[in-house]
């Protein structure tokens, strides 16, 4: 589990440090979602937040418990959604950058430093940033962003499951599982599928 030890030395000179992460780069369907989270200076996690970790390591139930606690404890937070149509138009990397920047721009207060999960970022606002590979398993603020992005995306995919029941989006959330690929083979793609993501198994090029 994570503490704010990464942020602590940064808070000596900065009052607002913001973690950024995304969910949904790899699925065949649905949006990519990014979140930005900034905690109060010298914040120390207590209670349920002591269980925070990379969202991929947490159960869905624990993520659902953590999300409201993150929102309540954060000084500022925002989530941005970029749908499949835009992903197809500008590609998944550009769509991910767009979602991350939209999340930052939506924050109630402007950060002084961005801590971004991964190895690349293209900022829109003139804010210093640091990319951190596997940051969601190293940095508290990034892990918090990963949970907010993941829970929001999961909510959207569950809603899409009701709209497009043939695909089981509430089970695989758009990822290329055997069941999902079989559903595409049987029914074709629906409106939220990413047309630019091809399936070689189905002979798509």
From Swiss-Prot:
Protein name: Ribonuclease HII
Annotated ranges, domain RNase H type-2: 15-205
Cofactor note: Manganese or magnesium. Binds 1 divalent metal ion per monomer in the absence of substrate. May bind a second metal ion after substrate binding.
Protein localization: Cytoplasm
Catalytic activities: Endonucleolytic cleavage to 5'-phosphomonoester
Organism from which the protein derives: Chlorobaculum parvum (strain DSM 263 / NCIMB 8327) (Chlorobium vibrioforme subsp. thiosulfatophilum)
Superkingdom of origin: Bacteria
Sequence similarity: Belongs to the RNase HII family.
A GO CC term assigned to this protein in UniProt: cytoplasm
Principal localisation: cytoplasm
Group of enzyme by EC: hydrolase
Example GO BP: mismatch repair
Residues noted as binding a divalent metal cation in the record, renumbered to the chain: 21-22, 117
One GO molecular-function entry: manganese ion binding
InterPro entries: RNase_HII, RNase_HII/HIII, RNase_HII/HIII_dom, RNaseH-like_sf, RNaseH_sf
Record's function text: Endonuclease that specifically degrades the RNA of RNA-DNA hybrids.
Hydrolase recorded as keyword: yes
Gene3D superfamilies named in the record: Ribonuclease H-like superfamily/Ribonuclease H
UniProt keyword list: Cytoplasm, Endonuclease, Hydrolase, Manganese, Metal-binding, Nuclease
Required cofactor names: Mn(2+); Mg(2+)
Annotated EC: 3.1.26.4
């Amino acid at each position: 589990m994570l503490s704010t030890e990464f942020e602590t030395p940064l808070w000596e000179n900065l009052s607002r440090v913001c973690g950024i992460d995304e969910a949904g780069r790899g699925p065949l369907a649905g949006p990519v979602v990014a979140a930005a989270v900034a905690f109060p200076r010298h914040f120390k996690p207590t209670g349920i937040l002591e269980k925070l970790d990379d969202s991929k390591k947490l159960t869905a139930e624990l993520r659902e418990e953590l999300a409201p606690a993150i929102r309540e404890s954060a000084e500022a937070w925002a989530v941005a959604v970029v749908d499949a149509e835009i992903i197809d138009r500008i590609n998944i990397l550009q769509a991910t950058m767009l979602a991350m920047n939209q999340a930052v721009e939506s924050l109630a207060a402007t950060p002084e430093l961005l801590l971004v999960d991964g190895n690349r970022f293209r900022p829109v606002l003139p804010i210093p940033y640091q990319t951190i590979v596997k940051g969601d398993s190293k940095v508290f603020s990034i892990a918090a962003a990963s949970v907010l992005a993941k829970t929001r995306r999961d909510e959207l995919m569950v809603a899409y499951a009701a709209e497009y029941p043939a695909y089981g989006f509430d089970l695989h959330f758009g990822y290329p599982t055997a069941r999902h690929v079989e559903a595409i083979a049987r029914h074709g793609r629906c409106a939220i599928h990413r047309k630019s993501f091809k399936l070689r198994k189905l002979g798509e090029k």
